Amino acid sequence: MIQYVSAHDDLTLWDKLCASLAASSLGSAVAEGDEENTVDVPKALHDADFSEQGLDAVGPEMAQALRDVLGANRLSAGIVLTSAGIPFMLSGEEFARTKYGNSDSYDSTKELNWLDWNRAWHMRDLIGFYAKLIALRKSDARWFDGNRKIVDTEGDELVFRVGDYLVAVNPSDRTGVVDVAAAAVEGDSGEMHRYWCCLGVSGRGVASAQGEVTTII
């Protein structure tokens, strides 16, 4: 089973998220006419500067749109790289590769299709996030084909356990609370649920373990 959220065909992940999340809230739409393969997205979303100075320069509405897209990008990576099967990535996804909304760029200019290493430098924090997920996956073969125990939740959260790891995905902007004791499996010590530690979070998220519950934002 191949797991992916971007490939050489269609929009890049970053462009998909810009079009579906940020562009709609900022009043952009799919382009028409001769640009049928292009999604019209504000240029600032593509040429993002995620330094605090860069975000301040684009104004609060655009800055929030950028943060939302980045958070969704990280969430997408987290889902793919903790899923069973074989993860697949478009080259450059790890630094938010953009083709400026072009979904069919096979006959476009080399400037549109090449990998922008300056962008990679500016998005190095996102690269670091991908690198940590990849290292985590490579450290335990159970990410590939291990059993997954699903933990019931009251909201939209997806929570499952793989080996000694608990993955909690919260796609909403509401705080979710998970009973980590419900993730116990045969062979756990009676107090194991008290010793979970947070290895990483995506987007604006915060995850903290206290006693028998984990809060995910």
Per-region residue spans from a language model:
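C-terminal beta-sandwich/jelly-roll accessory domains of carbohydrate-active enzymes
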Residues: D173-I217
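Loop/helix patches that line or flank the sugar-binding groove of alpha-linked glycan CAZymes
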Residues: M1-A181
